[in-house]
Amino acid sequence: MNDADVSKQIQQMVRFIRQEAEEKANEISISAEEEFNIERLQLLESAKRKLRQDYDRKLKQVDIRKRIDYSTQLNASRIKYLQAQDDVVTAMKDSAAKDLLRVSNDKNNYKKLLKSLIIESLLRLKEPSVLLRCREMDKKVVESVIEDAKRQYAEKAKVGSPKITIDEKVFLPPPPNPKLPDSHDPHCSGGVVLASQDGKIVCENTLDARLDVAFRQKLPQIRTRLVGAPETSRA
C-alpha cells in the first residue's frame, strides 16, 4: 500500500469519525431538547396547578366571606324585625296601661270590678281567712263590697263565709303621677292582692298584673296581627 492509499484510508476514517461524532452530537442535542421540553412542560403544568389551587383557595375564601356577610346581614335584619315587633307591642301595652288608669274613674263600674276581683281571688285561694291589700284611695270602695263579695264566694264555693282583713299598714302603690311621666316609682292602676294569713299563698289581682298576664298569653297573636307572620314562618 503506497502513501496515497494510506492517506485516502485515513481521510475516510476521519470522515467516518467526524460523521459519527456529528450524529452523536445531534442525538445528544435532540435528547437534551426533548428533556428540556419535558422539564419545561412539567414546570408549566406545576405552575398551572399552583395557579388553579390558589384560584380555588381564593374562590373558597370569597364564598366563605359572602356567606358570613349574608349571615351577618340576615341576623341584623332579624334583630331589626324583632326590635320593631317589640316597639309596637311595647307601645300597645303602654297605651293599654294608660287606659287602665281611667278604669277607676268610673266609680260604679270600678266598684263592680273590685268585687269581682275579690271573689275571683277568694276562689283561687280557697282559704278561710285572708289578708287583702288595696290602694289607700280604694279602701272605702273595698269596704263597701267586701260583705257582698264574701257572700257570693261562699255560695259559689259552697263553704262558710271567709274572714277578710284589710291590711291598713301596707297599701298598694298609688297610680302614676301624670306630672312625672318618666318616673320609675312603683305604681298601681287598681285592683287587689289577697294572701293567706301566713303569706305563703298570694293572688295578685291588680289591673296591672292582669294586663301583664294577658299580654304574655296573647303575645304570639298580638305580634302576628300587628306586625305580620312570625319570623320562623318566613324562613
Curated annotation (Swiss-Prot):
Q: InterPro entries from the entry?
A: ATPase_E_C, ATPase_V1_Esu
Q: Where this protein primarily resides, as one coarse class? A: membrane
- Which keywords belong to this entry? Acetylation, Coiled coil, Hydrogen ion transport, Ion transport, Membrane, Transport, Vacuole
Give the UniProt subcellular location, in the record's own words.
Vacuole membrane
How this chain sits in the membrane, per its record, is:
Peripheral membrane protein
GO annotation, cellular component aspect: cytosol; proton-transporting two-sector ATPase complex, catalytic domain; vacuolar membrane; vacuole
* Family to which the UniProt record says this protein belongs: Belongs to the V-ATPase E subunit family.
* Protein purpose: Subunit of the peripheral V1 complex of vacuolar ATPase essential for assembly or catalytic function. V-ATPase is responsible for acidifying a variety of intracellular compartments in eukaryotic cells.
| PANTHER family with a match to the protein in the record | ATPASE H+-TRANSPORTING V1 SUBUNIT E1A-RELATED
Name of this chain's protein: V-type proton ATPase subunit E2
